[in-house]
């Protein structure tokens, strides 16, 4: 392939009369604002006749399968819905064209119509809860969907043959400035011991990228008459599910159990290294993952960054991580278990992707380089070089692609089974 121009994703309706074009599939949440969802829809005016073309953006939280009419609750909740009448253009929906829209309209012709959505910054990022091996249907989680369809009005039943549905993602990247180095300490006084046991732990930094090892520095000062028999280090994912009420689910994603001992009246210092990988946690039902991709293309869910004053009640899933250091202390003495207790501290940290570098508008590709995506379609080039790629999003195991809503939810994992 020669010069590579601006990449644009496209998807057509089954009857080919409606095609949506988007400049990207991932839209970045910058905390204070979110990238606008801007694109165009190409329509066949002869097919439309008296009908209109609408485009909707929906953020939905799918929290379980549809059971036998339990209190009339459905299995999904729309957190945000916005509608635009793209054709014929409605005056109230008219917005200034973005550079991408100008170029697409110039290339596609007069029957290409723009649409733009603003995503509120307090909506959740795209998160999928990992389905179990036996689960079928759509997985639980938060997703964003752009839908274009032909109808006489918004209330009319949407037919699959003349509609287009595209799943996009709202993502966050690691901030450029990390927070303070995580440290924690605690002191425990035991019965029958004059002096305490002191545990201090720290991480080498506050922000880790996915796949990066986490170094945990553990320092123990044992002035008691008891022995520390074992040291347990774990990385835990916490998912706050904010829907009808708030519930927190925790899941270990990396663990190490060391047989290191600390004798009475002695000190101990060691650095432990753990690396949380999705590959080691594939069977954990309900684990929070980034977006809606296949296992090979996704990872553990990134930490959620919240702006000050964010309304936690409308945020579907808030993800955070902590390292827990636990000392297992020997049980002995006349009082047995009453005279001993485990000692633990927790270290919060951030797990995210680094902000990707901005790609230049034109990039030279060596002639012997094999294209990554075989669905890439390059149309005739001109001064506004645009490369169209089929909009295809590989799904997590157990997901459906563009099924009718009434088919959704069968066998989805339930939050209360996590």
From Swiss-Prot:
It is found in: Cytoplasm; Nucleus; Cell membrane; Membrane, Clathrin-coated pit. Constitutively phosphorylated at Ser-412 in the cytoplasm. At the plasma membrane, is rapidly dephosphorylated, a process that is required for clathrin binding and ADRB2 endocytosis but not for ADRB2 binding and desensitization. Once internalized, is rephosphorylated. The modification Phosphoserine is found at residue 412. Residues 1-163 are annotated as: Interaction with SRC. Residues 45-86 are annotated as: Interaction with CHRM2. 1D-myo-inositol hexakisphosphate binds at residues 250, 255, 324, 326. Belongs to the arrestin family. This is Beta-arrestin-1. It comes from Homo sapiens (Human). The gene is ARRB1.
